[in-house]
Amino acid sequence: MAAEKGGSSDEERKPLTRGGMEYRDSSNSLHYSSSAASLSLAVIDRINGSTHDTGPDEIGRGDRDYSDDGEYDIEEADYIPSGGKPVQKKVKIVLGFLLFLCLSGWSLAFVLFLFGGHESSKTSIVYEDNISDTGSQGIKITLDEVFDGTWSPNSRDISWIPGPNGEDGLLLEKGASISNGYLRVEDIVSRKDPKSSKKPIVLMQKAYFNVSGEAVFPSRVWPSPDLKTVLVLSNEEKNWRHSFTGKYWLFDVESQTGQPLDPAAKDQRVQLASWSPRSDAVVFTRDNNMFLRKLSSNEVIKITTNGGVNLFYGVPDWVYEEEVFSGNSVTWWADDGEYIAFLRTNESSVPEYPVQYFVSRPNGEIPKPGGESYPETRKIKYPKAGAPNPIVDLQFFDVGKDEVFSVDIKGDFADSNRLIIEVVWASNGKVIVRSTNRESDVLHVAVIDVFSRTGKIVRKEDINALDGGWVEPSQTTRFIPADPDNGRLNDGYIDTVIYEGRDQLAYYTPIDNPKPIVLTNGHSEVVQAPSGVDLKRGLVYFVVAGNEPWERHIYSVNFDGTSLQPVTNVSESSYYDVSFSNGAGYAFLKYAGPQVPWQKVISTPANEVTFEETIEENNHLSERLRQYTLESKIYQYIDIDGFSLPVLERRPPNFNQTKKYPVLFYLYGGPGSQTVKKKFNVDFQSYVAANLGYIVVTVDGRGTGFIGRKARCIIRGNLGHFESRDQIQAAKIWAAKPYVDESRISIWGWSYGGFMALKTIEQDGGRTFKYGIAVAPVTDWRYYDSIYTERYMHTPQRNPGGYDNAAISNTTALANNIRFLVMHGTADDNVHIQNSLTFIDKLDVNNVHNYDVHFFPDSDHSIYFHNAHKIVYSRLADWLVNAFNGEWLKTYDPTPNDSILRRAATWVGMSI
């Protein structure tokens, strides 16, 4: 697609209804690359567009611009006027009367402003970023470029790997040139020193190998801890968001040959496999049963035998995969390789939800003759709010005794009221288990001793009583072994705790001590901490939301809470991510914005060796920024009801304070989430601002993360109430700005953001927001999964009024909006299409028709099937342009004028 050059880049997209009355049509839009990046909940993150000077994320459309030099008059051009011929005298009288009304209104408004009460909100600008300095002469970004990778930063995938003899700073690299090996382990320091005696260890010379005439092409690889064997996955097929199946192989490094993981069933698909810390065995799950393959034998040991449709061993069911572990494994080896802990999940009582496929057949089965015309139905055990949950308990396998057992914990939650959210092996047969009640507001931390087969609860925290909040499931607890030589007399662990209204880092020692040493405190909150632990030097590394919530910086602190030190330059407003080597002597530092992202490997400050190597600089993006025109970004706060809320405003290039711009609000808004981030990101919002010429505003309202638990927890039991108020109040603030056209304000979101878009326009009733767009929205929280929903809403049985209030149900208010759009995939296994269908039924029952709808056959929550992802954003852009150009206003009073009547009369042979 040819790029646009020249012209005033602050112009809005020209109304498609002018000059021919052509309706904006998705079918003639963009030509997308087939390599569009994938979107899921991770997609939502990308759509949410981080915050920085980059730009587009979604739609690119049309080549015509127009200058928006004044407010759009619905009576001009091709809009349909009322009938009758103009009478000059009457016009003068009317105009004079209108002028009198305007002057009176302005005077009254001025008096009210001086003496009346003001809205309890204010704005304060903190940062303004504009990394594109081409002005109006730069090339405009297109929607194609947003999705074809043109603006995607290159990102090297470097994995740290522990050395077999305790070496630190080893990297696992995959996909290197054939001459250097396809899979190899390299010492980070020696790779810059040609004289070093530490040479790379080549694990796999080639990118494939043969087993009995079958070519095996690895999709994923896991070296054994001793680096002598590689566990290889091939023929991978996706299951749900994080899970997959495939064929597993064992590849011998010395001989460069492979064999099936299970020689007796090499073609059967395996759900999960993982190495023993001793490198002598692999545990795996197939058909929901667990097996053990010892490398000393070709025989496979059955650990469980009764797994099946309703009983899972070692792998999570749908809801635990999606809402608790965000992964495909619930299997944990003890560090000595003597025991395996795993979850047993019983779904017998969980109701099923049918997902239908009208075009494809995901199960791969050919229908019987006569059945070709029927859709394929996949039934998922999906616990909706208030429905029975899967029963989950922790089991253990004694490798030496070939025995499965469980351990009872006195005072623990009942089976039906328990969520197991984390399992961490300690030393000497001890296991740390974190669990919550069903509504996720009471936390139990238990310690189990597998030697004595006993367990006890060592910590209880009633989060609901503490601040009315909840426990977010996470898997970041880090075991800290005793080391008397370094001052650690007892085992312990590091966990994230609530301290003075924010998430902070704490160290518990001994392991059964309920009172911690708080390691961090203050205004900032830790993020998925800890990120790394240096046991030798007694240091914890972690990521923190910096001086402002949209930042991320790296810090370290001693185990005793002293010597809190920044690793990154905290004087700069930046966004970093990091991964640490096994011993935390080195860090893979990833700068994500606001400028062009880069990646470096560095030695950590406590390391005696000083090292730094740039891995990626993304020079191609720096060059592109010199050619293109992007939006400017304003990071600021607004105060609403006493809460200071982060806001990102994206302004079109060549922004003109004297013009009137339409405004699109974009949000996600889910509990604990964050959309206002200071990252380099060219996304759909960038496209809307930099190409279409609209302002885009994102507000992280109450309920979102990193603004304190008081603001976060206020939403509990009443999702959508405070969040929608924040969006409405923010829209009022922007509507009052001199450069905003208050008649053209819209809002859009996906998933939770779709729910928020609908809830906001429902609560606003057309007073501030005139338009709304919801993609894959929840419309009634009774239809969403139990673990997520009840965490924030309690159960429907306990909180029926809250569920009623949260549902999108006020059709009268929705009818007061000019128009809204709903899009949904029919095979969405996450937010079921039931949400949109029942919502549309409410609209039909109440004779509401000011909306559009688009369903995508066989698409899941990310909406990708058969070109659907392109169509989502093409449709979104088309619809938005038409909305802001008054297309839907024509339906308000569709009275034909005399020209239309004359044409109709001519067509039937009459004369007027």
From Swiss-Prot:
<feature type="glycosylation site" description="N-linked (GlcNAc...) asparagine">
    <location>
        <position position="210"/>
    </location>
</feature>
<feature type="topological domain" description="Cytoplasmic">
    <location>
        <begin position="1"/>
        <end position="92"/>
    </location>
</feature>
<keyword id="KW-0325">Glycoprotein</keyword>
<keyword id="KW-0735">Signal-anchor</keyword>
<dbReference type="GO" id="GO:0005886">
    <property type="term" value="C:plasma membrane"/>
</dbReference>
<comment type="function">
    <text>Type IV dipeptidyl-peptidase which removes N-terminal dipeptides sequentially from polypeptides having unsubstituted N-termini provided that the penultimate residue is proline.</text>
</comment>
<protein>
    <recommendedName>
        <fullName>Probable dipeptidyl-aminopeptidase B</fullName>
        <ecNumber>3.4.14.5</ecNumber>
    </recommendedName>
</protein>
<dbReference type="GO" id="GO:0004252">
    <property type="term" value="F:serine-type endopeptidase activity"/>
</dbReference>
<feature type="region of interest" description="Disordered">
    <location>
        <begin position="48"/>
        <end position="68"/>
    </location>
</feature>
<comment type="similarity">
    <text>Belongs to the peptidase S9B family.</text>
</comment>
<dbReference type="InterPro" id="IPR050278">
    <property type="entry name" value="Serine_Prot_S9B/DPPIV"/>
</dbReference>
<dbReference type="InterPro" id="IPR029058">
    <property type="entry name" value="AB_hydrolase_fold"/>
</dbReference>
<keyword id="KW-1133">Transmembrane helix</keyword>
<feature type="active site" description="Charge relay system">
    <location>
        <position position="828"/>
    </location>
</feature>
<feature type="transmembrane region" description="Helical; Signal-anchor for type II membrane protein">
    <location>
        <begin position="93"/>
        <end position="113"/>
    </location>
</feature>
<dbReference type="InterPro" id="IPR001375">
    <property type="entry name" value="Peptidase_S9_cat"/>
</dbReference>
<feature type="glycosylation site" description="N-linked (GlcNAc...) asparagine">
    <location>
        <position position="656"/>
    </location>
</feature>
<feature type="glycosylation site" description="N-linked (GlcNAc...) asparagine">
    <location>
        <position position="130"/>
    </location>
</feature>
<keyword id="KW-0031">Aminopeptidase</keyword>
<feature type="glycosylation site" description="N-linked (GlcNAc...) asparagine">
    <location>
        <position position="810"/>
    </location>
</feature>
<keyword id="KW-0472">Membrane</keyword>
<keyword id="KW-0926">Vacuole</keyword>
<dbReference type="GO" id="GO:0008239">
    <property type="term" value="F:dipeptidyl-peptidase activity"/>
</dbReference>
<feature type="active site" description="Charge relay system">
    <location>
        <position position="861"/>
    </location>
</feature>
<dbReference type="GO" id="GO:0005774">
    <property type="term" value="C:vacuolar membrane"/>
</dbReference>
<feature type="compositionally biased region" description="Basic and acidic residues">
    <location>
        <begin position="7"/>
        <end position="25"/>
    </location>
</feature>
<dbReference type="Pfam" id="PF00930">
    <property type="entry name" value="DPPIV_N"/>
</dbReference>
<keyword id="KW-0645">Protease</keyword>
<dbReference type="Pfam" id="PF00326">
    <property type="entry name" value="Peptidase_S9"/>
</dbReference>
<dbReference type="GO" id="GO:0006508">
    <property type="term" value="P:proteolysis"/>
</dbReference>
<keyword id="KW-0812">Transmembrane</keyword>
<dbReference type="InterPro" id="IPR002471">
    <property type="entry name" value="Pept_S9_AS"/>
</dbReference>
<feature type="region of interest" description="Disordered">
    <location>
        <begin position="1"/>
        <end position="29"/>
    </location>
</feature>
<feature type="glycosylation site" description="N-linked (GlcNAc...) asparagine">
    <location>
        <position position="897"/>
    </location>
</feature>
<feature type="topological domain" description="Vacuolar">
    <location>
        <begin position="114"/>
        <end position="912"/>
    </location>
</feature>
<dbReference type="InterPro" id="IPR002469">
    <property type="entry name" value="Peptidase_S9B_N"/>
</dbReference>
<dbReference type="GO" id="GO:0004177">
    <property type="term" value="F:aminopeptidase activity"/>
</dbReference>
<feature type="glycosylation site" description="N-linked (GlcNAc...) asparagine">
    <location>
        <position position="569"/>
    </location>
</feature>
<feature type="glycosylation site" description="N-linked (GlcNAc...) asparagine">
    <location>
        <position position="346"/>
    </location>
</feature>
<feature type="compositionally biased region" description="Basic and acidic residues">
    <location>
        <begin position="54"/>
        <end position="67"/>
    </location>
</feature>
<feature type="active site" description="Charge relay system">
    <location>
        <position position="751"/>
    </location>
</feature>
<keyword id="KW-0720">Serine protease</keyword>
